[in-house]
Amino acid sequence: YEQIGEKIEDTKALGGVQILIQGGHNPYIPFEWYLDLLRYIKTHHPIHIHGFSPSEVDFFSTRFRMDATEVIRELKAAGLDSIPGGGGEILVQRVRDIAAPKKAGADRWLEIMELAHNAGMKTSVTMMYGIGETLAERLEHLQRVRDLQARTNGFTAFITWPLQPENTPTMSHMPKTDATTYLRTVAISRIVLDNVPNLQSSWVTMGMKVGQMALKFGCNDFGSLMIEENVVSAANTTHRTTTDELDRLIVDAGFTPARRRQDYTIISSNDGLSIAAPALSATAAA
């Protein structure tokens, strides 16, 4: 816990306003350990905690024989503020059976998101494409997200990115998709998901210039400036930036940079010449 606390204080010292907690499915760590972690953070290092994707909630539910509603309630009571959209991949069971057979199924993933929304928690939602799905199945994924949002209005943002096949043993045979496909996917997502207020650009996977172009294809959020990231980088994809560079790219695209919180309330905005304090989130606001 203390090591995590040190990382949080480093984040706050740089102007950070939230942390993301995600991990593997470790059967040897008791559920109470996660609850104590949340309590520890809120007591000693208060910050917005965005954590525990539907896949992890499903794992907790199965491993500890708890209803998913109870898992979410316990996590929220301990200090969890919002839930990330990790593990969404493609929300079509045929694809998941091939690409991620041990993760929560498509229906279960959506069910857990709906339970979280009904519990008063906001979440993000994702789509990782290029894992063997058809174009029709990508659209089915988007439609299922749109349908759930119509019922709950609980999604704050949608983020899409392509599979990074390098160093991903089970998917290393898949071809890497190009920038054109990414920008088309962003544009189609913006049209279909007219009830999801924000689309986040994935410069982490696509690089800064393509990330900037995505602002013209439907994204209004340039994403976060991350202090530490271990998932995409493990797949041998590494792009680094600074707040000044994010600021400049947003201005050059014709937008005004702003710092935001997880719920998209604006902390501060400026003319793009500089950001007063180092920010971990940069949003392009029209």
Describe the role of every protein-language-model region.
Residues Y1-E140, R144-L148:
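Conserved Radical SAM active-site core
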